[in-house]
Amino acid sequence: MARLILILGDQLSRDVAALRAVQPGDVIVMAEVMAEASYVRHHPQKIAFLFAAMRKFAGQLRAEGLTVAYTTLDDPDNGQSIPSELLRRAAQHGATRVIATEPGEWRLIRALADLPLPVTQLPDDRFLASHAEFQDWAKDRKELRMEWFYRDMRRKTGLLMEGDQPAGGQWNFDHDNRKPARADLLRQAPPRFDPDPVTTEVLDLVAARFPDNFGRLRPFAYATDRAGALQVLDHFIAHSLDDFGPTQDAMLQDDPFLHHSVLSPYLNAGLLSPREVCDAAAKAYAAGQVRLNSAEGFIRQIIGWREFMRGIYFLEGPEYTSRNALNHHRNLPPLYWGAPTAMNCLSHAVAQTRDHAYAHHIQRLMVTGNFALLAGIDPHQVHEWYLEVYIDAYEWVEAPNVIGMSQFADGGVVGSKPYVSSGNYINKMSDYCKGCAYKVADKTGDKACPFNLLYWDFLARHRDRFATNPRIGRIYGTWDRMDPDRQSLIREQAAAFLARLDAGDPV
Ligand code: FAD
Ligand code: DLZ
Ligand code: SF4
């Protein structure tokens, strides 16, 4: 009896578990479906990227002689959801069971489990740590901290290890990083790819079917197959990795990419494997082509943060995205959808997101995320925004970054402190403030940077929770030393700003 082998849009790896299980007579099922394309209103470039990559991947499998039943979005027989397509294909091919690789989202894991056909969900072993390994690591720990997990992953992979010791004698070189960046005309941007006929057909489809989703569809310049993704990797290793470390926390308003790799779309869709990306970085270090602090910082993001976030998502369970530890209920303001704002940092971070479906980590954390947290925005709305607007967004990685790291809505599972800052941090790490209508040096008054007002207001509102936090508790000393009239003025002006935000007035 034929079996169906399910390959989802973010499982485009030749050695994904379900494909390794293929036997003669099996039918590989791939489907562009509205259920996946609309569970949030994804950025049009994200839909186009995945559909083009899916079509090309299917073509490669067919070229190997495998049988692929591929459904395009506009196929009149399309059942428009993964379960309905599996049932339709099972009837068509007389298949009685489905082999899948476990999806990266609880919603789909459950949908497959509920299918009225036997479904085997194989572990997704494209990740370094299995669920069991992460659970084992997490059990009996009072706090789950990425740094300890990361060291285990270094030992496990042998990456940047000299025997049982870390290369250079330290696990983490972040103290050499965190430098601001300067405008640099010679900095190499990631390679751009002109759409080929397959991609152009998909772009036309997306333009017709998703005209109202937030974000520009064209120009579209992402790679959509493994060969292109490998080109992006090679380019990053040759031109940007060496400077990655020092500038990884920097922001420049006219440079959306700096020395970031822009590899997350390819890693998350399966076109590149985390191991090969890290091996390439480690090899460049071993060859003396890049500094250790850059290679280490980059590898940590992948075998540390990326794996840790996935571990948390599966450890915490399906209700994680509903957490709201700080009881925040404000609606996401229209500026997140491109409504004009005088706040230059937000205006640029959102415009860049609209144009590229991309922002780098520190923009996501310290601009859009920081503002949402300071303003007390409902974390579920924030979560949906991030899931919608970024090309690399899948719940397993997006939710722990947003609900956990950025919004502290999980009460401290991911991070030991909330990532909040006044305008001072943004000014130090970027060139946004120079071009802003607000004054970053002003703590109160008409022109005061809203981050300055909201920072203290946030800390004052959440004093009970954070005053005893070992990482930020000390800041309350500064607040307490402030003149009470000044404290009142800050809080009044913060309240007035938030009232304008709620009223939909320009801010
Ligand atoms: P680089 O800076 O070049 O880093 C290299 C790689 O490290 C990335 O490609 C990524 O795979 C990995 N990485 C770095 N930081 C993280 C992290 N915190 N968690 C997981 N992986 C990491 N990343 C996603 O892949 N999808 C998301 O939906 C996503 N949402 C985020 C939301 C918020 C609020 C924050 C603060 C971070 C989010 N991240 C997400 C993490 C990070 O911002 C992106 O991985 C990174 O910006 C992708 O760009 P890059 O490939 O140029 O990364
Ligand atoms: C994100 C996405 C989109 C937009 N469309 C599809 C699709 O049509 N077919 C498909 O198989 N997968 C798609 N995906 C990726 C899935 O949403 C993803 O597999 C789950 O969210 C689990 O990570
Ligand atoms: Fe952003 Fe404040 Fe700087 Fe303006 S002054 S760019 S609002 S941090």
Regions found by a protein language model. Give the residues of each.
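A short acidic (Asp/Glu
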Residues: 15-18, 40-42, 80-83, 108-113, ...
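Short His-Asn-centered micro-motif
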Residues: 6-10, 31-32, 71-73, 100-103, ...
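N-terminal beta-strand-loop-alpha-helix module at the start
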Residues: 1-73
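N-terminal Rossmann-like or analogous alpha/beta NTP/dinucleotide-binding catalytic cores
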Residues: 42-89, 97, 102-104, 110, ...
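C-terminal catalytic domain of photolyase/cryptochrome flavoproteins
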Residues: 8, 220, 231, 248-250, ...
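Beta-rich, aromatic/charged-enriched effector core domains that present basic-aromatic interfaces
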Residues: 81-222, 403
